[in-house]
Regions:
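Short, low-complexity N-terminal regulatory "tails/caps" that precede and couple sensory modules
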Residues: 1-12
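Cyclic nucleotide signaling catalytic output domains
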Residues: 94, 139-168, 172-193
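PAS and PAS-like sensory/regulatory domains
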Residues: 134-138
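Short hydrophobic/aromatic beta-strand micro-patches
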Residues: 105-107, 143
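Short catalytic/binding micro-motifs of nucleotide second-messenger systems
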Residues: 80-88, 122-133, 164
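Conserved long alpha-helical elements within nucleotide-processing catalytic cores of c-di-GMP signaling
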Residues: 16, 21-46, 56-80, 95-99, ...
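A short pre-motif secondary-structure segment
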Residues: 86-96
Length: 193
């Protein structure tokens, strides 16, 4: 078999060379698999989208190498936070989204728990520099998968709330609202009949 043919059939790498997080395609494949599992089991999961605030300014002022250091530091800090005992009730996957953004899949996980995790991550990043004396902050969008929702819809909702966090001053967490399930609505309606 020729080298060209072998190169074409080789699997794409699963881990980002810089952050050692899952690559975007590998993370999205896991997200799709977990959505199918959640659809069968009813166990909720959440997606967190973390984006370094003003990364372009860091690259412009300190060089791309400094920006890379910040991303490596962000991935390491995220790993340390999710390894803390407070978060052991869930399993986590860390992936590289794009540019200065990382994704975390938390399963099983309610939106309220994901919001607390996001705040812990935000605080851990702001607490001390991520790299060579560069203090940074992150904005984080959080969304819980709605049963029957596509991965594209989940990603779009998570991106929207991340943009809201950026618009309202950065260094904050925003959570996408999740409408109550039909069962919860039926219980509430039953209370008022």
């Amino acid at each position: 078999m020729s080298e060209t043919l072998l190169a074409g059939t080789a699997k794409a790498p699963s881990f980002d060379a810089l952050t050692l997080a899952l690559t975007r395609p590998a993370f999205l494949a896991e997200l799709a698999e977990q959505a199918q599992i959640a659809g069968r089991s009813g166990n909720a999961f959440c997606l967190l989208l973390l984006d370094v605030d003003h990364l372009q300014n860091i690259n412009d002022c300190h060089g791309v190498g400094a920006g890379d250091e910040v991303l490596v530091g962000l991935a390491d800090r995220a790993r340390r936070v999710i390894a803390e005992p407070a978060w052991h009730r869930s399993e986590y996957s860390l992936g590289r989204y794009d540019g200065g953004a990382l994704m975390i899949l938390a399963r099983p996980c309610a939106a309220s728990q994901a919001e607390m995790l996001a705040e812990a991550l935000r605080f851990a990043v702001a607490e001390k520099p991520l790299g060579e004396r560069i203090s940074v902050t992150v904005s984080i969008g959080v969304a819980q998968l709605r049963i029957g929702e596509s991965i594209d819809e989940l990603l779009a909702r998570t991106e929207r709330v991340l943009h809201v966090a950026k618009q309202f001053g950065r260094d904050r967490v925003e959570v996408a609202s999740t409408p109550p399930s039909r069962v919860a609505r039926a219980k509430v309606v039953g209370l008022y009949d």
